[in-house]
Curated annotation (Swiss-Prot):
PANTHER family in UniProt: GLUCOSYL/GLUCURONOSYL TRANSFERASES, GLYCOSYLTRANSFERASE
Name assigned to this protein: Myricetin 3-O-rhamnoside 1,2-glucosyltransferase UGT709G2
Active site residues of this protein: 20 (proton acceptor), 117 (charge relay)
Function: Glucosyltransferase involved in montbretin A (MbA) biosynthesis. Catalyzes the glucosylation of myricetin 3-O-alpha-L-rhamnoside (MR) to produce myricetin 3-O-[beta-D-glucosyl-(1->2)-alpha-L-rhamnoside] (MRG), a precursor of MbA. MbA is a potent inhibitor of human pancreatic alpha-amylase and is being developed as drug candidate to treat type-2 diabetes. In vitro, is able to transfer UDP-xylose with 50-fold less efficiency compared with UDP-glucose.
Stated family: Belongs to the UDP-glycosyltransferase family.
Gene responsible for this protein: UGT709G2
EC number annotated for this UniProt entry: 2.4.1.-
Sequence positions that bind an anthocyanidin: 20, 380
Pathway(s): Flavonoid metabolism
Class of this enzyme: transferase
Tissue specificity remark: Expressed in young cromes.
Keyword Transferase: yes
Organism: Crocosmia x crocosmiiflora
CDD domains associated with the record: GT1_Gtf-like
UniProt binding sites for UDP-alpha-D-glucose: 340, 342, 357, 360-362, 365, 381-382
Length: 470
């Protein structure tokens, strides 16, 4: 059969968390524009949530397949504990995933390759056992990859674990390519005192898996991450930078579907419409961050004392002990929603600053919109992301671990109307222009995407007829 008539089938399997699902689903939509058959693997729990918020999802040759997550349906925890979820998927769900990969469907071709989330070893290991080519998606930042990959070197060099009384602002020397940039506080493993901690072991394994695929796919651009990419390619020579996914998808398809597992409250757009340009602080700490009631009150009072309007995403499970409904009453100055259409919010002319947890998707969306940030990172890659945007790219302020009301007030005023804020705005607008050009025809992300398509087409179809192991 001539190549132009060949049918190619890509299976994508993300870690079952909002940020990872969002990145993988945008990549899946990108790949579907090449005419590939796409199978997207969801856990049953997340797929039920997805159907409640994404009823209009309709893409040709695109299907969802589900596997259990190994937890009882009535488990009230949301999100499920990260390490427990990893272990449950690994021990209870391999057979279900294997069946997705080997199932015969007369209307669908065999699997050409799998795109596996680097944070989900199961997604990589099962297709390897079946002889199916695998590519790796690392949905976090390039800086996060290097810090995670360097953990064994930090252990060997005696820089990790950190002493009990360690100065968390001290710079580390053992981080590949980022010497003199990364502080102790920027490491995802900063809170762990033993190298045998399950999370430390997971971080090491996850980053060792990067080079096991035929290629590494990153949601970044050559211009943003040239420093880190040079070292990443020494580990993974075939690395495709396609970021930002949401921008590239818009340029290629002029349409994308939401990946949100939570219902977006669009009433906030009407509220923003009533506000002057660059007068609103948008506040969102993502889908996982939690805070004490005391921290919530300090943040809120600092925002009020700043004198600016603010729109705040408050998930029902975000504040420990919950909040009374009267505490979330909207006013002329403040507005609360459980979840927001974030890309649209950041693009709104009324928004002048983003108080963020520094998740990578949020960071990219803020850069594209040209909105400077104030960063209050919570865990994982958010820590190094905050360091990069504040110290390397100089498009944000880093709050470290502080959230006192006077500190919040000062930070907001600095970004919204201070001299530092003018510098941040200028820098992020310049970066936004670079990012947009990367995703345009002829730009690095656009060109790399076309090369990735060619790479996938070049992969031979595996023989997956044997299912005796299931």
């Amino acid at each position: 059969m001539a190549e132009k008539e060949a049918k190619h089938h890509v299976v994508l399997f993300p870690l079952p968390g909002q940020g990872h699902i969002g990145s993988m689903l945008k990549l899946a939509q990108l790949l579907s524009t090449a005419g590939f058959y796409i199978t997207f693997v969801h856990t049953e729990r997340n797929y039920r949530r997805f159907l409640l918020t994404s009823t209009s999802f309709n893409v040709p040759k695109f299907r969802f397949r589900t596997i259990p997550d190994g937890f009882p349906d009535n488990d009230p925890r949301s999100p499920l504990p990260f390490i427990e979820l990893q272990e449950s998927l690994d021990t209870k769900c391999k057979g279900y995933y294997r069946e997705v990969l080997v199932a015969v469907d007369e209307e669908w071709p065999p699997v050409t390759c799998v795109v596996a989330d680097t944070a989900l070893p199961l997604a990589l290991e099962v297709p390897e056992e079946l002889g199916i080519p695998v590519m790796i998606l690392a949905p976090h930042s390039a800086g996060s990859i290097l810090t995670g990959y360097s953990i064994p070197q930090l252990i060997q060099g005696g820089e990790f674990p950190f002493p009990e009384d360690a100065d968390m602002d001290e710079l580390l020397q053992g981080v590949l390519g980022l010497e003199g940039i990364v502080r102790r506080r920027d490491m995802s493993v900063r809170g762990f005192k033993s190298i045998d901690s399950p999370f430390v072991r997971f971080e090491v394994k996850m980053n060792q898996n990067l080079s096991r695929g035929r290629a590494l796919i990153l949601n970044t651009t050559e211009s943003m991450d040239s420093l880190a990419l040079r070292h990443i390619r020494s580990i993974c020579p075939t690395t495709y930078t396609l970021g930002p996914f949401h921008v590239l998808l818009r340029n290629i398809k002029d349409q994308s579907h939401s990946a949100s597992l939570s219902e977006e409250d669009r009433s906030c757009i009407a509220w923003l419409d009533t506000k002057p340009n660059k007068s609103v602080v948008y506040v969102s700490f993502g889908s996982l961050a939690a805070m004490s009631r005391e921290a919530f009150l300090e943040f809120q009072q600092g925002l009020l004392d700043s004198g600016y309007h603010f729109l705040w995403v408050i998930r029902p499970d975000m504040v420990e002990g919950g909040l009374e409904e009267c505490e979330l009453t909207a006013s002329e100055r403040r507005y609360f929603v459980k979840w927001a259409p974030q890309e649209e919010v950041l693009a709104h002319p009324a928004v002048g600053c983003f108080l963020t947890h520094s998740g990578w998707n949020s960071t990219l969306e803020s850069i594209y919109a040209g909105v400077p940030m104030i960063c209050w990172p919570f865990f994982a890659d958010q820590l190094i992301n905050s360091r990069f945007v504040s110290e390397v790219w100089k498009i944000a302020l880093d709050m470290k671990d502080l959230c006192g009301r006077s500190y919040v007030e000062r930070m907001v005023k600095e970004v919204m109307s201070g001299e530092k804020g003018k510098e941040l705005r200028k820098s992020i607008c310049e970066m936004a222009d670079m990012v947009k050009k990367s995703a345009e025809e002829g730009g690095s992300s656009y060109t790399n995407f076309k090369e990735l398509i060619g790479h996938i087409k070049s992969l031979s179809l595996p023989a997956c007829s044997s299912t005796s192991g299931f």
